[in-house]
UniProtKB/Swiss-Prot annotation:
Coiled coil residues, start to end: none
Stored InterPro entries: Aldolase_TIM (IPR013785), His_biosynth (IPR006062), HisA_bact_arch (IPR006063), Isoase_HisA-like (IPR044524), Isoase_HisA-like_bact (IPR023016), RibuloseP-bd_barrel (IPR011060)
CDD domains, alphabetized: HisA
Pathway(s) per entry: Amino-acid biosynthesis; L-histidine biosynthesis; L-histidine from 5-phospho-alpha-D-ribose 1-diphosphate: step 4/9
Family membership noted in the UniProt record: Belongs to the HisA/HisF family.
Entry keywords, A to Z: Amino-acid biosynthesis, Cytoplasm, Histidine biosynthesis, Isomerase
Enzyme kind, highest EC tier: isomerase
Name of the protein: 1-(5-phosphoribosyl)-5-[(5-phosphoribosylamino)methylideneamino] imidazole-4-carboxamide isomerase
UniProt source species: Prochlorococcus marinus (strain MIT 9313)
Gene Ontology biological process terms, A to Z: L-histidine biosynthetic process; L-tryptophan biosynthetic process
Amino acid sequence: MEIIPAIDLLDSVCVRLHQGDYEKVTRFSEDPVDQALSWQKQGATRLHLVDLDGAKSGEPVNDSCVRAITSALNIPVQLGGGVRTLERAEELLAYGLEQVILGTVAIEQPQLVKQLAQRNPGRIIVGIDAKNGKVATRGWISQSEVNATDLASDFNAAGIAAIISTDIATDGTLEGPNLESLRAMANASSVPVIASGGVGCMADLLSLLALEPYGVSGVIVGRALYDGKVDLKEAIRAIGDGRLQDPPTSKPLMA
């Protein structure tokens, strides 16, 4: 299972939000490029970037910072937050991002996402951010009545690379991932699912291995790394390539 460290950008500073609340911001690094290089040095095989300003406003506020990070790293970088047009997505891909993550447009303009996936095979990810099973959009400010699993199944034949499933209620809390919602998302999707939200310790990462047989292929970790609750090198040894643990072959979790 791939462990993907996260850098959330707000005014070009590395921060974390609590449950997506822009009023509950913790600043972790004034130098996101240095932070990105640190994660790469510790063994990260991919970096997850979120433009929080873009997610909220739809404007590319942190582009210079994103470009600097992408240029500095030798590992693939994926970006989400405010990517809402075909032109914007392909602009980002053209200057070095490996993948772009589409959230709001996945629910508002699903055909645009499908078009992008066809034009850019393997480079389009759908981000599904949900609270109580319902999809949230526009930086989690707007709540829809669309079921997260229904949205996932809508993209099964679209050619997207993966779905990032974020549980807003656990994001930034360190209280553990929502295994039930992840299992439901993996069952609804025919593409790999990447877990996001709630990881607070090594035991949480190990618990995700039980979902690997269902299609959960990776996990995004943010606050737990910054708070020192999880050591990236140890986490990679525990559940990454070459790990000692194997995912369960039985299906002990909820049916």
